[in-house]
């Protein structure tokens, strides 16, 4: 089991293996871009140019995300999974997660027969979704305060 190893081995956690930040760092490290490990533009440029080192890391990352989706799907049976944040603007990401998800189901007939692959899509508002959520929360709070004053 993974019990107790987390502090010593973060790779035991889905939050680590499915971290876009870690994936980008690994790609930049593999490319020798050590001066800016957080350079997402450089990482996705290498992916889109089909750099073999970058692709291997990227495909493993997408496979890990697909596995996480399968695990969640077996519990909640979602109609779709939505990827948000800045990384959701990368169409290659959404395509590869869907690709890895279908590969897993094809290569594991037992799983494939028991579940239908939910579509994985990019969030409508992408990296701005958190801003819309914050604005909505503020508007609700202001409405509540206004209502309280009127009562």
Model segments located where?
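ATP-binding/phosphotransfer module of carbohydrate and carboxylate kinases, centering on a glycine-rich
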Residues: 4-151
């Amino acid at each position: 089991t993974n019990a107790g190893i987390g502090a010593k081995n973060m790779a035991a956690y889905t939050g680590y293996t499915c971290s876009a930040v870690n994936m980008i760092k690994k790609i930049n490290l593999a490319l020798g871009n050590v001066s800016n490990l957080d350079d997402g533009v450089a990482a996705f440029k290498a992916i889109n140019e089909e750099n073999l080192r970058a692709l291997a890391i990227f495909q493993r990352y997408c496979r890990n995300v697909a596995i996480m989706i399968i695990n969640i799907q077996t519990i909640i049976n979602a109609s779709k999974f939505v990827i948000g944040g800045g990384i959701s603007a990368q169409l290659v990401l959404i395509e590869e997660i869907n690709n890895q998800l279908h590969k897993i189901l094809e290569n594991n007939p037992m799983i494939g027969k028991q579940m239908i692959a939910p579509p994985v899509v990019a969030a409508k508002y992408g990296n701005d979704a958190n801003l819309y959520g914050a604005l909505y929360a503020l508007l609700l709070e202001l409405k509540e305060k206004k209502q309280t004053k009127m009562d």
